């Protein structure tokens, strides 16, 4: 898919090209957990909120199968249409390759138009010299991806104007509290949005969201500050690979939301889950928890026992 946009695509003589469609796989753990006496306590709203489904069932639900097939088909159709346009191969042929051929040796890939040539690595210098109109004995000048990206970053860091557009990256799961390297801390980001709202040199904000969601509370904290920010200046959200659940929640206040054609977004709903280990301790390890409490539900949420019906309704 990525290679197809190139003017020319080459493959090593001992290479292989694979073309086999898309798949999504998950493991369902209901019986495995029961075997060990582990009881998941799950509260879920929304039949398409499927993240907790593997802990509840042994089979995929119809709703989850439907949504998974929908987004896989959407991604696949976009991919083959793009490849078809770039390589001048019909979508029917590309689907046939995925269904019946799957693997292509170099000659086969060239015959059907997936590649343009077959070369060893040492032959590529000569190919590139010819492609760029140079003499075959000239030295090929190249730049590494690292050096090129470093140069671009240096150019982007130039501060040339008193009027600025702020770019904020919100990447990772959404957690309560402060930011860390792999998560979006609700309090930390709310403070960033507050500062941007107050900064008169910032004329607009672009929020790049790449998040599967997380804490509903942290999402609400950020949503509030983003709503206040939008009242003062334009707010644009750019979605990355995914902006699901809380990731969509924090995107909602934007004046405009922009996605890539393959962004996965939605998953609007809530769930809560924790495991209880009372049966594991009693029946497998001969450990017997005992509790003393002042009221019937003083130990609600204990990992030693499941929720009762009243507590489930409360949740």
Model-based region annotation:
Residues 117, 125-131:
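Terminal amphipathic helices with adjacent charged low-complexity linkers/tails
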Residues 109:
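Short, contiguous alpha-helical
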